[in-house]
Amino acid sequence: MLKFIQNNREITALLAVVLLFVLPGFLDRQYLSVQTLTMVYSSAQILILLAMGATLVMLTRNIDVSVGSITGMCAVLLGMLLNAGYSLPVACVTTLLLGLLAGFFNGVLVAWLKIPAIVATLGTLGLYRGIMLLWTGGKWIEGLPAELKQLSAPLLFGVSAIGWLTIILVAFMAWLLAKTAFGRSFYATGDNLQGARQLGVRTEAIRIVAFSLNGCMAALAGIVFASQIGFIPNQTGTGLEMKAIAACVLGGISLLGGSGAIIGAVLGAWFLTQIDSVLVLLRIPAWWNDFIAGLVLLAVLVFDGRLRCALERNLRRQKYARFMTPPPSVKPASSGKKREAA
């Protein structure tokens, strides 16, 4: 049972999402509706995109804490370009290129300059946040064109154009990691770096690609953010990096690298977003959101750690069982010997 849970973390994450959807339905029947699902999905799109990017980085046994700042910086660039009169396609492509460049810079620091990922991305977190504030002067960007907001307007089955794009990206990333040699290279790099090199995997290039795609996903999340709310505050993206990492951990992405799946990260992002909707249903103040999300994350980490220790004990027991000599069995004295002694 323990091995099944460890090897199928996506199933346990799915069960958690289903339970969190069904149980509040006993309090309010209207909660069990397609409208609720589309509402939660719309709110979860930003975190889903960030979780997909974070998955690539975490699979290579790295971590990126600058994605929130990249999201904010890219959202600001999008708003500035649109207000300067550039067309929406040009502004979006430029924004994605900026995110790709920011992620590439993170990858160079980690893969080529050998700076620990947490240290490098802590530095770029401040750098990108500073660039964002320098561009805006600490002010909000408002007056965005209506065509940007149309990207998040319901298009088909209550899902927006960006929502359908997110679904396509999830399916593509899941296929890429599971079915292609390129995708398996991310797992090999995080599981055994030296072994991957001996197999011919270009581990430095894989890590740079992981950080670059992570930055691109953060830029796309910035576009989604701007299209959903219609303006860009000066604190856009703050704290999103921690939520993205939490979503990945909840979905079974290992902090030690080399294991996990995109679907698990998506379910983790959905679960964290759904917590917010349940708190609204229960009329719990919004400032409890981070506390409860953190509590859930800690519980999952403790459970994951205990599960890992239990599995390691079982593996050791199975490995050394054949070397352990059974205790000598004591045979009862025969009845004949008992009579002779008498």
Swiss-Prot record:
A Pfam family per the record: BPD_transp_2
A GO CC annotation given for this chain: plasma membrane
Transmembrane segments: 14-34, 39-59, 70-90, 93-113, 115-135, 155-175, 213-233, 252-272, 284-304
Domain of life: Bacteria
Main location class: membrane
Topological domains annotated Cytoplasmic: 35-38, 91-92, 136-154, 234-251, 305-342
Cellular compartments annotated: Cell inner membrane
Periplasmic topology ranges: 1-13, 60-69, 114, 176-212, 273-283
Membrane topology, from the record: Multi-pass membrane protein
A GO molecular-function descriptor: transmembrane transporter activity
Keywords of this entry: Cell inner membrane, Cell membrane, Membrane, Transmembrane, Transmembrane helix, Transport
Coiled-coil intervals, chain numbering: none
Keyword ATP-binding: no
InterPro entries: ABC_transp_permease
Subunit structure: The complex is composed of two ATP-binding proteins (LsrA), two transmembrane proteins (LsrC and LsrD) and a solute-binding protein (LsrB).
Protein function: Part of the ABC transporter complex LsrABCD involved in autoinducer 2 (AI-2) import. Probably responsible for the translocation of the substrate across the membrane.
PANTHER family found in the cross-reference section: ABC TRANSPORTER PERMEASE PROTEIN YPHD-RELATED-RELATED, AUTOINDUCER 2 IMPORT SYSTEM PERMEASE PROTEIN LSRC
Record-stated family: Belongs to the binding-protein-dependent transport system permease family. AraH/RbsC subfamily.
Protein name: Autoinducer 2 import system permease protein LsrC
